[in-house]
């Protein structure tokens, strides 16, 4: 008989759902723009069985992939588990066999040495396939329409790295998928690699290099000429695993680094720039103006996770709030200092997104989730530590911003931009995001006019179920699905 822990990561608004299914023609409130023809894929952690340990955490769940298929003013829905090696062997056993988050020392003996990946962090269509990703394991390939799992890939045996990041970027000019790996030669190793995959899914390059210290490298930036790696001291070690401590611990005594690697260079061309201790979040975008390299992302004074502190200090939710910030370094300089640090937005924010047609280049428009602690929250159980209750838009050319609050009983999941047409100007289009009603226990996929989010949704696809809090997802126009059709 299944019994999930009554802990914050497995109860209330984060209670596991474990639902697979299909819905044709979801009920719509308003009108879906009829020209939208494509897919929105997103993923959330959702353990298929109760964890081996009561103190397990949210990020350790099996990947559950959701597909919203837009066509003819309608939206269809499909949801399936990413059938990783872990998922399959536990399905056969009828119970969890893998232990604590990223700790192989806690696994059942029967699965020692197996790939522990859950494919629960991000999904993206590339080369006609759906890439399901988690940064501690290889990339999992799925069919973007049926959501059937094909299996892990090492790109025809050519990729040497054992892991594949969860936040690749597609260069809009070349069509290449730009990615990286950390722990590339095994858990706790300093080995990293910068990776590019062709539009047809072939490995083009894998540039190995070393990290200053082993840490969580969740996201990165890519410009026209450079790969940009923000390194923060969210650390791990075998000692931590042997003591059954949480996998990561944030060390407030160590500096942060920004690594700049020419995309057409090698490890000898890599430069590290240094700054003071801080916590960095997801990357909005990066670009370079000659030798000057810029990366935009939320930056906070201290650890943003309430359960990761190497010194045991209590979580400080104020110091942990991130604000969209631009770091600038100059590859023509002789030193290792930042040229400039500039805050771009004065409200605490996360999950930043852009018009992906402007990825790797100078850009103007951005969207993000805002943590508005001044707004009330009236759902049972109280808010979890980072309630993303507001959707924001910023125009970096004018500095103007607008926002929409979801209401006192709702949270918003990561937004995603869709161009109005392939040749529409930057930022002209729609933003979609799941809005979770924590009282009614339903989720709506809300559609906004991208530059007028303050006016609220122009349409809602009303699901008859709640979709568990997710991590990341992406839009793919129908033309990118042609190979898979």
Swiss-Prot record:
GO terms under biological process: carotene catabolic process; lignin catabolic process
InterPro entries: Carotenoid_Oase
Catalytic activity: 1,2-bis(4-hydroxy-3-methoxyphenyl)ethylene + O2 = 2 vanillin
Reported regulation of activity: Activity is high with beta-1 type stilbene and minimal with beta-5 type stilbene. A 4-hydroxyl group and trans-stilbene structure is essential for the binding of substrates to the enzyme. Inhibited by N-benzylideneaniline-hydroxy and -methoxy derivatives and N-(4-hydroxybenzyl)-3-methoxyaniline but not N-benzylideneaniline. Fluorinated olefin (Z)-1-fluoro-1(4-hydroxyphenyl)-2-phenylethylene is also a potent inhibitor. Imine linkage instead of ethylene bridge in the substrate enhances the inhibitory activity.
Binding-site positions, Fe cation: 167, 218, 282, 472
Pfam family, one: RPE65
Activity vs pH: Optimum pH is 8.5. Active from 5.5-10.5.
Co-factor remark: 1 Fe(2+) ion per subunit.
Notes on temperature effects: Optimum temperature is 30 degrees Celsius. Stable at 4 degrees Celsius with minimal loss of activity.
Protein's job: Catalyzes the cleavage of the interphenyl double bond (C alpha-C beta) of lignin-derived polyphenolic diaryl-propane type compounds (Stilbene).
PANTHER family documented for this protein: BETA-CAROTENE DIOXYGENASE (PTHR10543), CAROTENOID 9,10(9',10')-CLEAVAGE DIOXYGENASE 1 (PTHR10543:SF89)
Similarity section: Belongs to the carotenoid oxygenase family.
Protein name, per record: Lignostilbene-alpha,beta-dioxygenase isozyme I
Organism: Sphingomonas paucimobilis
